[in-house]
Regions:
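Conserved catalytic Walker-motif region of ABC-type ATPase nucleotide-binding domains
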Residues: 4
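Low-complexity, intrinsically disordered or signal/transmembrane-proximal segments
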Residues: 8-9, 20, 26
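Short linear motifs in low-complexity or flexible loops
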Residues: 14, 23-24
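Alpha-helix boundary/capping motif
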Residues: 19-21, 31
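Conserved, well-structured ligand/cofactor-binding cores
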Residues: 39-302
């Protein structure tokens, strides 16, 4: 008998708890896509410069901790914002900062008009249509957007970033229409709708209802933000709506895979099949980790 041992190396484990395998008695959905859930005020997650995996996003979506920024993240954001302010003051054309957009890229915008330029950019792109996406999708999209600000490369200042964190921590989620992305060129409309509440415009999910953001800002004692150079562009550029939808699709697929493993185990027991095919030694002959995962899941529930 020749004993074969695989040398397959799994990807490095996430810094957050693994939630892929089935545990006896574990709920399949475990509240992952439930709506109207509130932030866990007893648990805090510090947003760092580390890479976030799908498993990290899943854990955040399930546990809904309060958010705060690591000091290193704050330093990078502040440095990036200062860099943009310095460049905007120079006598040179900087796209979307002291110039118009698209075909107006060579039209200079004066210093006193830069704030209005960013405001108009956000408002003019908030033209999404269709039904409002679920609150869970809006929340995940907003978290992924926060991750894009960590390096300071967008040039956004701390005020909009902190406002998004405050909205998360107080269960205030942007109400975002379903249709409006232009794909790889950017989720312009969805992200613009995400940014509207920062300006006291648009609507939000709040206390189980969709309401005008202006009233919520008044209730929280928050003033509408005034965008600095490039901040409207930083808020609307990106594919975080697509990212969030894709992440949720993958999470749902993995939940379906868990269900399939349960059905396979139930069928095996119902038909009194041999136990050999899901025992660990049998799967040491393969380099496919997915086979091992399915076999492990079946053993856990049998």
């Amino acid at each position: 008998v020749i004993e074969l041992r695989g040398s397959h190396q799994r990807f490095p484990s996430s810094k957050l708890p693994n939630d892929h395998d089935i545990a006896p008695g574990q709920s399949i959905s475990n509240g992952l896509f439930e709506e109207g859930l509130m932030t866990n005020q007893t648990q805090t997650h510090q947003v760092t410069l580390d890479f976030y995996t799908l498993n990290d996003l899943r854990t955040i979506a399930k546990t809904l901790p309060r958010l705060e920024l690591h000091p290193d993240v704050i330093t990078k954001i502040e440095a990036g914002a200062q860099f943009v302010l310095e460049k905007a003051a120079e006598d040179r054309y900087i796209y979307g900062t002291n110039t118009g957009f698209g075909s107006l890229c060579e039209t200079r915008v004066e210093n006193e008009e830069m704030e209005m330029l960013q405001f108009n950019h956000v408002v003019s792109h908030a033209v999404g249509v269709g039904e409002i996406v679920p609150e869970s999708l809006s929340r995940l999209m907003m978290f992924i957007k926060l991750l894009t600000f960590r390096t300071g490369h967008t040039g956004i200042s701390m005020a909009p970033v902190q406002r998004l964190i405050d909205m998360w921590n107080n269960d205030i989620m942007p109400a975002i229409p379903k249709k409006g992305t232009v794909g790889a060129s950017g989720d312009l409309a969805p992200l613009a709708h995400m940014a509207l509440p920062l300006l006291g415009l648009g609507k939000v999910y709040y206390q189980g209802e969709i309401v005008e953001s202006a009233g919520v800002l008044d209730a929280m004692g928050w003033e509408p933000l005034r965008l600095k150079p490039k901040e409207g562009l930083a808020l609307t550029n990106g594919v975080q709506y697509i990212n969030a939808r894709g992440a949720q699709c993958l999470m749902r697929i993995e939940e379906m895979m868990k269900t399939a493993d349960l059905f396979a185990a139930m069928s095996s027991q119902a038909f009194s099949t041999s136990e050999t095919f899901y025992q660990a030694p049998y799967h040491e002959t393969t380099f496919h980790p997915e086979r091992k995962t399915v076999a492990t899941n079946m053993r856990k529930v049998l």
